[in-house]
């Protein structure tokens, strides 16, 4: 969710950081490379796909009249309980805010190929 929202928002700093964090946590390179193409990729679970759909629609509010569609919410509710949906919404709101701060501040992606997991400031 953080990677996809950061990609949509054009935040190189956050995209770079969250990909490095995910790789450090054991995520595969293939899945990381396919986040932007999740609709066509077969490497994501149905729950992950539902979360990515909510992330896209919630990030592209200006592009989608009414925000997240009823269909996307219903699909997400099949995979996540109420607390998990609240966590998803909260995560999405926070990453969108951080993306905007980083883009406005013109924070460049890290120059290093490694990062300290959890590092969030320049």
What annotation goes with each model-predicted range?
Residues 2-122:
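Hydrophobic alpha-helical segments
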């Amino acid at each position: 969710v953080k990677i996809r929202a950061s990609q949509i928002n054009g935040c190189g700093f956050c995209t770079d950081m969250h990909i490095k964090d995910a790789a450090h946590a054991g995520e595969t390179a293939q899945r990381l490379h396919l986040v932007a193409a999740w609709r066509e990729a077969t490497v994501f679970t149905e729950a992950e796909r539902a979360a990515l759909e909510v992330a896209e629609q919630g990030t592209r509010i200006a592009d989608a009249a009414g925000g997240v569609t009823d269909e996307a919410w219903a699909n997400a509710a099949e995979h996540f309980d109420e607390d998990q949906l609240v966590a998803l919404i909260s995560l999405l709101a926070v990453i969108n805010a951080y993306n905007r701060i980083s883009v406005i501040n013109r924070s460049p992606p890290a120059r290093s190929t490694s990062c300290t997991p959890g590092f969030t400031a320049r």
